Amino acid sequence: MSFKCIFLTGGVVSSLGKGLTAASLALLLERQSLKVSMLKLDPYLNVDPGTMNPYEHGEVYVTNDGIETDLDLGHYHRFSSVKLSKYSTATSGQIYARVIKKEREGVYLGSTVQVIPHITNEIIEVILECARENQPDVLIVEIGGTVGDIESLPFLEAIRQFRYEHAENCFSIHMTYVPYLKAAGEVKTKPTQHSVQSLRSIGIIPDAILCRSESSLSPDVKKKISLFCNVPNNAVFNVVDIEHSIYEMPLMLSQENISTFITEKLGLFTKQEDLSDWKTLVERLRNPSLDKVRIGLVGKYVQHKDAYKSVFEALTHAALSLNSSVEILPLDSEDPHFLETLEQCDGCLVPGGFGSRGWEGKITAAKLCRERGIPYFGICLGMQVLVVEYARNVLRLEKANSTEMDAETPDPVICMMDGQASLVATGGTMRLGAYPCLISPGTKVHEAYGESEVMERHRHRYEVNFDYVQQFKDFGLNVVGTCPQQGLCEIVEIENHPWMIGVQFHPEFLSKLIAPHPLFVGFIQAAILYSRNKSYVQA
């Protein structure tokens, strides 16, 4: 085997931060001059999260090749330079579908198809496919869920077999939670012990245990975990709950020397990672500038921040790059009083979404921003909100709407894309992935990008109806970005407004701490200017 493989499992509780841990490890290993690839294995039976409720699963992250994935892949992107694609994710639903397809094609020659060996072999094949496609020095494989879940068992068995065949090239990290009981005044290691016992009963002996806790574990506690979990004392690592920013995680792991421990065990003798630039950025996040802007994020899933995870992070990246900080106020567009809060904000962002719930509230938000000169950034559905509001209140097309919200509207300024109406399946059938966009010169968007052609990622079925484009232009709303392949409207911009822009794509998927997205930077710049001078009056 030409690559090394790091397996990351979790125990005790869910939401431990395995995705952040995997992403942070990728950063540390890359800073040691290693080429890293990543794979997320999710035990749920959905083929992908594309049709899952955001309240249940969080946002859907889209790759360049149009794969709808778990939000953890967003962490992978933001922390590292790993290339993400269809080879970077697999679910139980996909694995079972592949096996059933092979059975129907006669690949198994009449054998009884079983979880072992057929499902486990397919999981191993997914791991090898990822390695073959990317040719990494190190492949990090994160297994979703918690040890003990029934759904996880085939994945853990596959890992056991893989480690048995390639023991010298594999490293297993088990992440657990060590709770602090206030009444007893001490931390409890028993949940970690039981979790490791469950993992060992499957046949996987972890090479390291990563313990998450509220505060630092004492050497005695680490020694106890080492003794009862049968791992060396120097293989017990600790990360505490993050105080300020998720971007502190790589620094915590670096302080624990976990990446050095891993590379030495795998025989990868590399240089010490250099995180000086990362430390500088994190220090600025810990000590934010006094120049702060308030951004109202108007949506319908605002009670669950993970539903807009990439948007939150992209705003943070942009503000940091401008030596500013951002306070994000989630505003429910169904709340009858949300406009009172939005009026006090320095900018408004309406993110992507689907369905009519909260639609009219978003339109009132766009109207407020247009009339008051508040910077407005509409993403996907947020762009469609901008267009419909403008049609109703500037073009005086009072019943203008999107056909998604009103199929009988007399003025369908937003309509379904050609070819979408005939589709029966909903999963994986939208316009997905990266497409080129040509940007008009002399526009705010061109000024932000500094170039005339960009690639951006999409996830939508509806588009601006080109039958209305000239009318919009006559009244000051311009299409300033188009797809050269399909002639679709990708970006709109309003004249005589400080910053009111809508994009059909999802720029948040490309933003990183070390490389903020230019449109988010432009938006925050406009919000800073607005916060300093709120005397704008619409012409």
Swiss-Prot record:
* Binding-site residues, L-glutamine: Y55, G353, L381, G382, M383, Q384, E404, R461
User: Which UniProt key words apply to this protein?
Assistant: ATP-binding, Glutamine amidotransferase, Ligase, Magnesium, Metal-binding, Nucleotide-binding, Pyrimidine biosynthesis
What pathway is this protein a component of? Pyrimidine metabolism; CTP biosynthesis via de novo pathway; CTP from UDP: step 2/2
Q: Origin, by domain of life?
A: Bacteria
The chemistry this enzyme catalyses reads:
UTP + L-glutamine + ATP + H2O = CTP + L-glutamate + ADP + phosphate + 2 H(+); L-glutamine + H2O = L-glutamate + NH4(+); UTP + NH4(+) + ATP = CTP + ADP + phosphate + 2 H(+)
Indicate which residues the UniProt annotation says bind Mg(2+).
Answer: D72, E142
Q: Offer an example of a GO molecular function term for this protein.
A: CTP synthase activity
Q: What is this protein called?
A: CTP synthase
Q: Which organism is it from?
A: Chlamydia felis (strain Fe/C-56) (Chlamydophila felis)
